[in-house]
């Protein structure tokens, strides 16, 4: 089951049951974390138990040079993602006791390096009323929306650059500028 949070950027610790192998069933349960498959960031074994470290669904953490995990989203983007996931989960009427709210979760703001403390709902994978396929579709939809937004922003910037170039008119070659300057000195 999803047992606890890990200090860092949106990490989940998935607790393996005693003797539970990391087999196809387990990976299928975990596949909801990313539409492309399971992204394992590591494995911890100790007195507390055996854990797989995973990213939060829809939030893709990046490892920095010093091995601390920094989320790729800026603070505003991150909160937008959190609200989207929360709203989508509410739409599927998951009972509140199946959500774990952890205000201690910390993200590091890539711009300032300071921690950001959102409250993100974490579905308990094996006790979830929402089916795994439906949750995977939800995560895929969030990723697709992100991609479309990025494409729209790129298109808008390109259109703005073209309009600006039209206002300026065609650029003069520098030789012609120099020739015009000398010819017009009189």
Region spans (language model):
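Gram-positive cell-envelope targeting signals
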Residues: 1-10, 14, 19, 73, ...
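Catalytic-loop of the protein kinase fold
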Residues: 74, 78-81, 86-124
């Amino acid at each position: 089951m999803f047992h606890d949070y890990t200090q860092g950027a949106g990490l989940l610790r998935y607790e393996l049951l005693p003797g539970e192998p990391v087999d196809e069933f387990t990976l299928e349960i975990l596949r909801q974390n990313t539409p492309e498959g399971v992204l394992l960031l590591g494995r911890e074994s100790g007195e507390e138990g055996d854990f797989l470290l995973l990213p939060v669904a829809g939030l893709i953490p990046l490892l920095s040079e010093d091995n601390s995990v920094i989320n790729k989203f800026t603070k505003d983007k991150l909160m937008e993602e959190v609200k989207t996931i929360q709203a989508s989960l509410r739409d599927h009427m998951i009972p509140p006791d199946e959500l774990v709210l952890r205000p201690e979760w910390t993200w590091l703001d890539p711009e300032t390096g300071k921690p950001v403390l959102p409250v993100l709902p974490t579905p308990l994978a094996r006790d979830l009323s929402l089916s795994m396929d439906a949750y995977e579709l939800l995560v895929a939809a969030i990723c697709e929306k992100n991609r479309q937004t990025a494409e729209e922003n790129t298109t808008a910037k390109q259109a703005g650059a073209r309009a600006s170039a039209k206002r300026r008119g065609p650029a003069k070659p520098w030789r012609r500028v120099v020739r015009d300057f000398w010819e017009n000195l009189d």
